[in-house]
Amino acid sequence: MSHDRFVFLFVAIFVLFLASCRGPTVSPISSVPPPGPRSYAVYYGEKSPAPALSGVDWAIVQDNYPPGKNGRTLYFAYISMGEIDPGTRIAKDISRSPGGLESVTLGKNLFWNSRIADIRKKSFRQALLMQIKRDTKRGFGGIFLDTLDSPLEYGRTHPRQAAGIRRAMESFIETVHASYPTLYIVVNRGFGLLPELAPFVSGVLYEDFCSRYDEVGKHYVTVPAGEREKFLRDISRARTHNPGLVVLALDYDDPRRPALSYPCARMARKEKFLHYVSDWTLTRSVPGPPLGWTGE
């Protein structure tokens, strides 16, 4: 055997040896979800500390609420990504930009007296990013992006005017995730877009999982099973992109007569969702089923 052939054979054997010593290849997304929260609450009141937030792992609050420092609870600052509420810092920031609020308005939400906002507009995106920056500086470990359904519904009814809005929503959340890689992000619903968003978010709030507040009739009602099944399929698809996606089921009920939401707790456990019940103003928690409740 010539010297050159011997050297080549030796190098080849050495490379194979090194390859055999390597550990297993790590997938970008683990098939085993990481440990998540065991409890959560949503509170939009001003009382601090709020009894509803006592001892929970995740707390979703208005961004003017002081995030606690007990070490256990992770606080999420509320940010409306699909609508602009009057009088907010975001509304004031956009008012000072060229074109003002009208330049980013797609329509109106008459019940909440808010504007359905256009995430494609640079001024709106910048205002949102500035709010996120302020919230992280105040000590929030997460953000809660609300009202995703509003621009999605606008896109469904106005497909030409809303061209590109879905991709703009997705790209905005990608930008936030890239800018704040350790920041927890939870979105409210947005199920039609959830599979695309899943790799960039920590969780989804399933508002109106089983019971909700009828804004027209001004009373609490049960959510039809058929409506829920469709969204459960969207969640299942999203979890193929992010197996650790946390689902927070939120229901509404009358604190004085809360039996309407009792079956919801059982449904949430079956789906392995965390469950919370509140009055429609999100300022008062609603107790769950009493001990021994059988559903009869």
Residue ranges and their predicted role:
Residues 18-20:
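C-terminal motif of bacterial Sec signal peptides marking the signal peptidase cleavage site
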Residues 1-8:
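Bacterial N-terminal signal peptides that target proteins for export
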Residues 26-296:
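Glycan-processing catalytic domains of CAZymes
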Residues 22-24:
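Sec-dependent signal peptide cleavage junction
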Residues 8-16:
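Sec-dependent N-terminal signal peptides
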